[in-house]
A protein has these predicted regions:
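ATP-dependent carboxylate-amine ligase catalytic core
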Residues: 5-9, 27-36, 40-52, 77-111, ...
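ATP-binding Walker
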Residues: 62-64
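Hydrophobic positions on the alpha1 helix immediately C-terminal to the Walker A/P-loop
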Residues: 66-70
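Internal gly/pro-rich beta-alpha loop/helix module
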Residues: 189-190, 203-218, 222-223
């Protein structure tokens, strides 16, 4: 595969990827495609990359991002190479998929501001444009055949990159819900549920109990 591509070609690829983003505001619950069948099928094709590292899986209505970032900061301060998968991004799509580690010539100290890359002595690396290009180009026909969503593709991209980068641990944030979320193909070493509130009621249920049931779907036996 040729690795050379222009910035314009890369941006066009991202535009096609963003077209797959569910338009909840415009379409409503009909844009939500729950289930992990596509993910399990592709995961098998790719050789189960997430089995190469330990995972902390996080779900909840509020606080997922803060908890994810604080955990990443704490783990990196112990000398671990930590993959971090969060959403949404602000400026760059690649912000969703990062690796945080401790600079070899310094001592890391956890940062309390929820930004692991700001921790003293830490190094943060975004997934490379080259990897994004190669991965999506390689699997484009499969994505189209399965009609995979934006979040499914992004999650697969993250899980594979983390394996290729040989991370020690991954902090994995759900996108929506938990039980049927694209991230729920993994078996973590720790499942974390943050605050539960009435959100996405047309997709997750109209009561706190129903929503909590969906979020708790990331909890695995003996974990």
């Amino acid at each position: 595969m040729c690795n050379k591509f222009s910035e314009e070609e890369y941006n066009r690829m991202l535009e096609k990827l963003f077209v797959r983003f569910p338009s909840f505001q415009k379409v409503g619950a009909g844009a939500y495609k729950p289930g992990i069948g596509n993910m399990e099928f592709f995961d098998q094709l790719a050789g189960h990359p997430h089995r190469q590292y330990r995972i902390i899986h996080i779900a909840g209505t509020n606080g997922k991002g803060s908890v994810s970032n604080m955990l990443t900061s704490a783990l990196a301060s112990q000398g671990l190479k930590v993959g971090l998968y969060t959403s949404p991004h602000i400026l760059d799509f690649r912000e969703r998929i990062r690796i945080v580690s401790c600079h070899p010539d310094s001592s890391c100290h956890p940062d309390s501001s929820c930004h692991p890359e700001r921790s003293e002595g830490s190094l943060a690396t975004l997934i490379s444009k080259d990897y994004v290009w190669q991965f999506i180009s390689r699997w484009q026909e499969t994505f189209d055949h399965l009609d995979m969503s934006f979040f499914e593709i992004t999650t697969l991209l993250a899980l594979n990159w983390f394996a290729d980068q040989e991370v020690d641990m991954v902090v994995l944030e759900t996108g929506l819900g938990g039980r049927l979320d694209s991230t729920n193909i993994v078996t973590p070493v720790l499942s974390v549920i943050t605050n539960i509130g009435l959100d996405h009621c047309d997709m997750l249920g109209g009561t706190l109990s129903e929503i909590a049931f969906e979020k708790a779907g990331i909890i695995k036996p003996k974990v």
